């Protein structure tokens, strides 16, 4: 947390700044207090650029101000392919050039073109021409208009949300005049649907125009049947009076076509404005979610873990975008309904009310169905969130899952969640499909009932004009009823999604007042940097807060019920009352005495100390005593319950290393201006020069997501360099030395902490007590919650905790080492500094030579690690459709597909022929048949169409759900078994996108698109066949109209498809950035870089919207031009009818016109469905790729090569001529490695950074396969075994222990293979629980509300937060040791496993390892050499080769050995060796 507390910022200014808050009652603490001249300036802009015209957006949108060159390249470049299209011969062969700069690009023309061009969207033609010749590039698109940029849109939305917040608070103050401001902020909750109202106000003009267009489109479609009636009556009269002039009929024909044209124009503009609103709303809410997470409190982040936020942005916002495009239809629905009712009554008389009654009956049935759909959607969302959260956790920790062979366990967990999710989705889809089938069949059923009633009332009154005009009106209502369920269904999704998002936006935030209160008081001693006076701090009790919120909810619900049932419950305690009593007891217990050693660390009480400017303070203590918490308390990140903290100067906390997916340089300067001299000095003092030299592109090498190309020590030093590069007054360092070896640690201490930062106030939490003498004073934290501060000598005299810790440290050796260095320095005389630099340079050169192969093996030659986002080009391959169909039908394909085709044909035939049969009935075609014959068959065709339609939708739904389920699960299975090299080089956001947005598309959108496409295609074919049957000459026009249709569709798809894919790629960048920001939230807030990352997000969202806006416009362009084709089609038909070119009856004309005048809608619908299907098939394509084509590791199980259960019984490991590379084609990392490790031997592995230490572990676990040679364990070649059989026999304690959200029990034994007694025993043996305390711990139970606050920290049922955030790093390492004990393996690998624990705990762990794994083979990679000096043998690696391999004493005895030199630098002397033989 970075804060600045000084006189330069007045309290008034701070309060004014805190007003600039979005979507929350509270301000962001981390960005309010600042006077630092070296602040993050990469997203800054001058006040003079804040013009009301929006021109400042252009300046803010310059990528070079806050994006590195790699970021710009990623979002502005993609591969170029020439297009080969059907009509390429009509265009010139010249390939258009790609604009290279923004100046060469045209601004989005929507507000900069004439009315005619806007009316027909002609301004999009340049993009279509380019897209027809080659693949569209990001720079081909129109650049963002400031009025449509996310910055402008979000500013408007923010103002509306603040207005609603203030309005809500004002109401609360009026109801509770005694309430304090803090109570108002906490309790004034927004009304439901506030976010929706804010969005509607943001887009009020735009959305109002959409509603106007929707009403106009509905009105024109409602009046068109009246022209149809006139046309039929004209044909009827013309058949009787042959001499009638045809001009009147031609006028009717042209009038009908003009009405169709107006309808198509308004319909397309309605969709354009509403879809545009959907795209913009999604962008706004994406930014709102990210900005909220920057301000969210710890409890809010507990309630909304990263996986849940990701689910909001990827899934819910996509549904909201889709829903907003249909909602204006609801506003236009009453108008068309009124028009149709009036015209039906005019045509048919009061009898029309019968059919209208059927419509209203169906509407009320649909309300019940909507309630069911709502319930299924809410239930499905719960499982979707759980699945996405688990997938995110799995992907973040996939290496750990591979180490522990937990792939099957997590695959099963995900499969179980997915099965439950699919169950709800299936029920929702079936309910929705029944509703759609009913809505589409309702007009036919209503017309059937109406005509039957009309016949009974008036047996002879069947005029063709009235009948078919009414049928057209019913068909218009059919179209409306088709869209109504979609509008309401998507509206339900939108309301649910916005409700979930509103709960996030209302979540509690960091208290900004805590930062303001840290300003020094008047009279503050200027010599002090920090002072604490009677301060108490505590971490939030998440479980208690959850219980309180639950009780509030129950009380609120019960209060509503009691209003209705007050008499029945009078005098009886309610459930909420009991809950409140239990909560009171919890709060009392919580404040009672407790043994901090046995429970979770909660906080500090009554802290009193001060720190002077320039002091170097060390904080130490046993693990779990709150060292990191004390730093957070100083930084203002921990909740203060009492006292006063005063900070005088800029303060920066350097916490757990977070590495951004960017170059090394960008990670170090982190948004500050680049100063080469300062940068080089920072790199030197942080001991990074040698590491940068070995990287292919030096400090411009892309590190890769999650720092995949770096060791733990390198990540720690880059994290340190980032903080040092910032110019601050007070530095808080959280164990920055734990991940580096003693030599590097000493260099950092000398050159950085006590060198470059010598004049700064430095506070270091550490276990490295060998350097404690360098501290001005030391703060020792005790297991009883006490804090003791003093000089080292003072504390040695009185503090038993420090005395115990020092007994395990190498302090005395360090003194000897310093004495030796003093002698050397004296001999060197005047060469002091120059000689040290030269020596360091030589050491770094050696390190460069030794580690070049190792590290370069992880990086491709140009310095990039992340693979480029895959973007398909041209049409979807048939293979994808084949794989999708295979997943959909399984073994029933020979039945399901033919049956579906039969049902589609049957539905179309019955639907169309019911109208034909109505014409037969109207003209009494079969003279000798009774009316019951016509009525019976008409009824049959109507109800058969309904039954066939239901069957068709049900089968398609079943197939779509099955395909989505199995493709997702197969992709999950494959990603769990893909090599680490793929995971390391693929951004997490991209992978997660496959299991969020792509999966959601298959669950909810693809089936709908396929249904639309198949049904509308069948309808169009049916209408064309009908026209040819009645008007044979029309067959001549069909090829010409087909060519025009294909011409338009081909031009559209050439660009529309590519721009949609481009939008998907740009969307992935937005999601990648969001995931990265969520993962590095603490670091970003500490460096006050929120604005920079929000600016980067704005840039990426704008790039996404440049494509997204065009996707919308292209759909409308093609819609209008297809309308023209359909109008030409209709004009030919109507002219053939009115001119009597063929002798057809008026009733037959009525049938033709009823369907021909629907053609514009049918053509638009099918093209939209085809396009949407192809877009959704892109999601299927990506999932199919993951499900079938991801690279796989070697066989997970080999039944024919399963070793005996007792293998390995000895633990002997032999490396024979082993060569190892991280990926095929990359340099060899381990070279010709030959080792023979005997059964039960304890091998210590050491070497400089990049020497290949951790690579041995990768080779043993076969994370990648050997390039040459073999590894034998108990004479079994491990390459012949299945990975499951190999890895489950190995145990590892990694450097970065991982905990999964859940309980300790699930983290130790996710398969439930062990008994509780075995797990308790492992916790005791691992040192997590004292043996004497075990009986008491076993008896502990959660309290009445299910909270675990009073239980032992390592109780099996103790809750584990996401990424184990409620456990310290040392505690997580104890649990990693316990995991290894649970596995009961014969071979144990320690990868710098005790780097983050104090020396006492380190000693205890080493002792337990010796005791518990005494008969096991141990390979220990360590930078604390003292932990391995008494191992059986030491392996020293250099350049991936064996440099030395012998007993520790033998190597130490050799004056020129590498091991001897390393021991000397670590202060290890002869007395440290127990075995000197």
From Swiss-Prot:
Topology with respect to the bilayer: Multi-pass membrane protein
Extracellular side: 228-249, 350-357, 455-478, 637-892, 962-1027, 1139-1141
Phosphoserine, modified sites: 10, 24
Known EC number: 7.2.2.2, 7.6.2.3
Positions of ATP 2 binding: 1247-1254
Short motif Diacidic ER export motif DxE, span: 71-73
Official protein name in the record: Oligomycin resistance ATP-dependent permease YOR1
